[in-house]
Amino acid sequence: FDASAQDDEPLQGLDSETSLPTLAEKERWLQEVMEHPDCFTLVVEQAGNIVGLLESRVRELPRSNAHVLRFYVSLSAPVRRRGIGSELLARMIEWAHAQERIKKISLGVLSTNTPAISLYQRLGFVEEGRKKMEYHLPDGSFADEISMALFLRRKL
């Protein structure tokens, strides 16, 4: 599950299904992630192919958001709804609990992605708000972006 520089080229296989960046952008990103102590990244490989990615990082700017971990997760269609997403998120949440400064994990999810929303809710994430008509989908419809968060520690 741990990402390395060797995973960059296979990650291109996810591009047809996701909005991942170009190869050059991925190379810069992966190098930055590998060197950054406030990033947590997992790559899922199956039969020699990259089929999933979870990337998370602590917000550094503004400094008032330095307690927030934001993440992105992508799984190719054949491996969805098999527990892989749950495992990726569980590992990230476990890592986040060990990082004293992280108090909140946040994400944005399309309102049309009901399986992901259900998973996040099962893990304790709550809806914080919506950006109406944030995404224009290929079929011509629009989807909201739902902001969700998991609060790890509360100041008493």
Model regions and ranges:
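A short, well-structured alpha-helix characteristic of acyl/acetyltransferase catalytic modules
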Residues: 1-17, 155-156
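Acetyl-CoA-dependent GNAT
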Residues: 17-78, 89-90, 95, 151-154
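Hydrophobic packing within well-folded, soluble alpha/beta domains
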Residues: 44, 88, 92, 105, ...
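Conserved active-site alpha-helix within GNAT-family acetyltransferase domains
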Residues: 82, 86-87, 98, 111-129
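Conserved GNAT acetyl-CoA-binding A-motif
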Residues: 96-108
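Conserved catalytic-core motifs of GNAT/GCN5-like acyltransferases
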Residues: 106-109, 121, 126-141
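Terminal substrate-recognition subdomain of acyl/acetyltransferases
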Residues: 141-156
